[in-house]
Amino acid sequence: MSKYIGIFVFVFSLFSLGVHAGESFRFRVYLKDKGDSGYTLDNPEEYLSKESVERRNRQGISVSESDLPIAQAYLDTLSANGGKPVLESKWFSTVVVSSPDSLVAERLSRLPIVDSVKWVWKGDEEIDIPREEKDTTRFMPIDKPEKSPYGYAEEQIKMLNGIKLHEAGFKGEGMRVAVVDAGFMNVDRISVFDSLRLLGTHNVVFPGRSVFIGDDHGTKVLSCLAADAPGLMVGTAPQAEYWLIKSEDSRSEFPIEEDYWTAAMEFADS
């Protein structure tokens, strides 16, 4: 009998703490302001890249308060109260925090720096099955070249009237493009991307993990832009430079998708 009482007490404790084995919770914390980060509008190069500053100067876009980062002291306060910061938005003054305790939201909402707290996700933190990196397989085209140099992209580029732009010399040279999508599976192995001008990758959803595994929707989108295999497929901007940013967890649909997308936009803009 005592054994069953012990089990009951343990299970009751889990539910009373808002904890479910194997689950984690994420909450969007709306801050009342961003605090004093130590940065100023007079020195944007301290928190924006050189390219971002130059683009703003070229396009007449002024640096504003929305560009200033959230104060580290605010992030530390959230962390000290049980919410581990995993995403932040300087544009909206929000921070997404992670915790195994669903009741952390109530504690955070009482902090003087916090305006409100919203639940945005729950699930297992560990996911993703990593690709076997020892596999160096290259994916070569099996299709026969088409008569048109644009190959399978001919109808698309005709529809966009892009051939005239290419004939005039506009193929994306000197432009930087951020492709924000759910994943770019095998872009690093598909031969039509051998000439891809890749500036870098960024994984908003699973920081530090490759964007070249998992979902392939971004691969398809990128092929319409950057593929450069005459006779097979030539995209609309094969000479542009690209950032590939993973911003979606395709396993599920939760409000945190808004935070992922915002983080991707802010990364690209900065």
Residue ranges and their predicted role:
Residues 22-24, 40, 153, 163-258:
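Subtilisin-like serine protease catalytic core
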Residues 110-175, 188-192:
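Protease zymogen maturation seam
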Residues 86, 108, 169, 234-236, ...:
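A general structural signal for stabilizing positions within well-ordered secondary structure
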Residues 21-138:
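Inhibitory N-terminal propeptides of secreted protease zymogens
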Residues 10, 101-103, 161-165, 227-229, ...:
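Short alpha-helical segments and helix-capping/turn motifs at coil-helix boundaries
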Residues 261-270:
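Hydrophobic, small-residue-rich alpha-helical packing segments that form membrane-like cores
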Residues 1-24:
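Bacterial Sec-dependent N-terminal signal peptides
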